[in-house]
Structures are given as structure tokens and as C-alpha cells.
Amino acid sequence: DQTVQMLGFSQYTTQTRISSLNMFAYTASLMIGTAGLPHVIIRFFTVPTVKDARSSAGWALVFIAILYTTAPAVAAMARLNIMQTIEPSPGEYLKIDERPDWFRNWENTGLLVIEDKNGDGRIQYSADAETNELVKLDRDILVLANPEIAQLPNWVIALVAAGGLAAALSTAAGLLLAISSAISHDLLKGTFMPNISEKAELNASRCAMAAAIAGAGYLGLHPPGFAAGTVALAFGLAASSIFPALMMGIFSKTVTREGAIAGMLSGIGVTLFYVFQHKGIMFVADWTYLEHLTPHWFFGIEPNAFGVFGAIVNFSVALLVSQLTSAPPERIQALVEDIRIPMGSDVAVIHP
């Protein structure tokens, strides 16, 4: 905090992002969004029993908690390493000709840019845009660059790079599998075309996967923001659409199919409306609307943190529509009861 404040930045550990309400919404969106991620939910099909599923969920929560609690520490260390590289001691700035190799490597990618504004041959780093000479430092490079900045051994750098690549590929593969199976098996075969052949179902799965890859490629060319912000946005969309339906499907026997569908469409629709109003339709900056509204006009909430409010809309609409439509069939209500009370369990018995 002392080093950050010396350079004119806000204190790191006590800095509140816009407001306490916004921070609460951000945290809640990440929490419930995690529970609604499709590639996480699908992992429960890999265990044989309910007991193993619960154990798997418990261990998943442990590792997710470790990830969430250590991420701010990694960010703090990365920021401190960069500041100590540029300003090793108070008032002594790094000479441009003596900048380390990692500096030059990332300059070649265009993700790190310096500009000697005062012509003194040194790099000044400060919160003042007019005097700051580190004009661009892409936040997406910090995880990969941090071991090199800290001068760790090459094998550590390779391990971090391999871990990042493996995480990206495994997540992408899990999401593609979830998307393709949901559309081909659950939607087409389970709802609209129950007599569809296996070959047609496989072709539908391939088409859905190709469409998902095309959509991901488009978002790669027009990213909504830096990586962490984009991930938070994805968690918010999962929170506003999947999580409420998942919870009501487990704990409510009165929510109807029409209510669940209406709730999901309303939740994700409201969230996308708020996100696109800030970032442009399909994240194209020129395709904006309601420009007269101030940024974060809904109680100072950022678009990446809006997922929890979309979830509230989802719950409300689903419950309302369920009251206006016929009750679910008995077999569905029995299925919900069976989910909560697994096979082999029974009601509590009072022993004398």
C-alpha cells in the first residue's frame, strides 16, 4: 500500500470498487455464477453415487475458494514487482536502455508500451496520465509475465504457461461439450424431436459446436474487456440464467416448465440489456443505445456485477409465471422430491 500510494495510486487493500453495494453484487455474482457454470455442473455426471457427487462438490468448493482468495494476492505481487522494477528505490527510475529482457519481450507483442515523455532516458510510472511513461500495460499479461518479472527459474515460467494453456483448453472443451449436448440431446431429442435418429443428433451436436466456436472466435476478435473482466461477465450471465433454474429445480415442486423458461429468458435478457447498454450490442462499441444515461446508472452497479440482479429477476418471473400456469405433473414433483431425498434414505424414526 505504501509503494502504491507513493506513486499516487489508491491504497490497494482498502480500495472499494465504486461502492460497497457494487462490491457485494460483484462477489454475489461470482459466487452464484460459479454454481451455474455448465462445464462445472456436467462434472457431476462423472461420479457414480449421490454421496460421491456431494463429496465432489465439496472438494470443488475448496479449490474454488483457494483460487478466489489467492487471486488478489497474485495481483498485488504482480503490481509490486512491476513498480519495484521501474522504481527500485524512491526517486530512482529504471533507465530505458537497462530495462530487463521481459520488458523487451512484451514490448514486441504490443501489450506493453513505454513513451519517454520528458526525454530523460528513464521510465516514470505514476497515476498522472500526463507524466506516466508506462502508457500501456495489458492486464492480461500479468499472470504469465509475473514469474519472469520476479526472476523465477525458467521451469517455473514454463509451468505457469503450461498451466494457463491447459486451463484454457480444458475449460473450452468442457463448455463446448456442455453446449453441444444441451442443444442436440436435451433440447432437440428431449423436447422438440424425440424421434430423431442418433446420426441426426450427432450432426446437430457438431453444428452446435461449430456455432459455439464461431461465437467464441467473434468474441475473441471483439473482447468485452480484459480476461478477468470477461470471466466475471460470463459468471454473471450464468448467475442470471442457469443458477435460479437449478435451485428451483431442486428445492421447489411448484415451479413449472413455463415459469423456468420465462425466468431464464427474463434474467439473461435484463442482464444483457444492461451489459450491452454499457459495452455496445455484441460488444461493438459503436452499437450503443440510451447514451444519455450515466455509466453505472443502476445504483452504481458495473455491468460485470449485474448478474445477481438478473438472478433476482429470474426468480421473480419464474415464480410469478408458475402461479399463472398449471402445476407440474406428479412425476416431475416426485422427481424433485427424489433429488432431495436420494434412493435408500427414509424419514427420521423416533426410537423409544
Q: Residue ranges of each PLM-predicted region?
A:
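Membrane-embedded helix-loop-helix hairpins and adjacent transmembrane boundary segments
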Residues: 1-352
